[in-house]
Structure formats: structure tokens, C-alpha cells
Amino acid sequence: MNAANQPHALALVFPGQGSQSIGMLAELSELHPSIKAAFEEASDGAGVDLWALSQAGPEEMLGRTEYTQPALLAAGIAVWRLWQQQGGATPAVLAGHSLGEYTALVAAGALSLKDGAHLVRIRGQLMQDAAPAGVGAMAAVLGADDALVEAVCMEASGAQVVVPANYNSPGQIVIGGDAAAVDRALALLVERGVRKAVKLAVSVPSHTPLM
């Protein structure tokens, strides 16, 4: 039996876009120089100072997917390395959602951080080219039945596109598509009693036909 099949085996899943914020990891970096070192390494691959961007912005630039992706890759690896330095348990499985797949590859040693940052910068540029900023949007829908979200997306689409993009967990779905269609879907969901539906801080409608 391999480690992944053992009872209580640890799995780490790295996140995708949307969790970036100005000042992220600032406090940890004051205690652990390895945080900033990871950002510097990733900056060499991305061709931009990711630490300066993540600490001082501008926020609009950090929110553009070609910069969001390498910045979050750097953040994920910085935390992963700190986990290792602090004696964190060795996971049996490393995985990731969307961008997080690249973070998992770097953490597993299949890619260097520099190469990973270079790749996701290009990935972000290609995604932004497919749907220029402002064209698309994404939103998280909490506490709604899958069938309701799917029906609302169909109703809101019209001549545009809005679809369930990610089924994150029971009761948590991310929708995405044309910005106006996403807005229509959010309004319909509120009308139908959905308790929480919020726009995400992303500049492209990932995992939708617009990509």
C-alpha cells in the first residue's frame, strides 16, 4: 500500500486565483526571510518585482491575471517552504486547483520556482488576451442548490455566456462568463433567496467557454 492509501495520510491542495491582496505575507516576512526570498526567485522568472507589487500595488495591476498568477505562485511556495522549515508533516499528496496545479508541481520538485513563475506569467497573458479586462467576471455562490444555479445561468445568459465554472463543494459554486451576464445571474440569485453571492477579484472568467 502506498502512502496515499494510508489512513490519515496528509494531502495539501494549493489554491487558484482570487485570494491575492496588497500586503499579503508582510508580517510573516518580518519573521522569516525565506518568504521574501521565494518572491525574489519567482520575480526572476516572471520578469517583474512580485514582492514590491504584492506589498505596494497598484492593486489594479496585482489583480491582472498575468501578475496575479506568478504572485500567488510565489506566495504558495513561500508558505510551503516555511511549512517545511518549521517541521510540518510531509504530505502524501500535493495537488492544486487551476493555478494551484503549478504551485503543486513546484512544491513537488517537478518545476523550479523560476520556471513556474515564467510559465504562469505567460499563461496569464494568454488568458487575458482571450478575455480582455472588463469583458468577463466570476462570482462565488454560497448556499444554493446546483440545479438552481445552473437554471439561473441559463436564464441569465441570453446572447452572452454565464456558466457554473467550478463546483468547489456542496453549496459552493463559482460562476463565470461575460460580465453583464454574471451581473444578471447574481441579481436573479438574490431574487430567489440565495444568501450570499459575491464577485471575485479576478480579471478573467477562468474555466468558462470564454477561455
What annotation goes with each model-predicted range?
Residues 17-19, 46, 68, 108-211:
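Alpha/beta catalytic cores of group-transfer enzymes, especially the acyltransferase/condensing modules
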Residues 25, 106-108:
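Short acidic, glycine/serine/threonine-rich loops at helix termini
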Residues 59-60, 95-99, 124, 136-140:
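Short, glycine/charge-rich beta-strand/loop segments that flank catalytic centers
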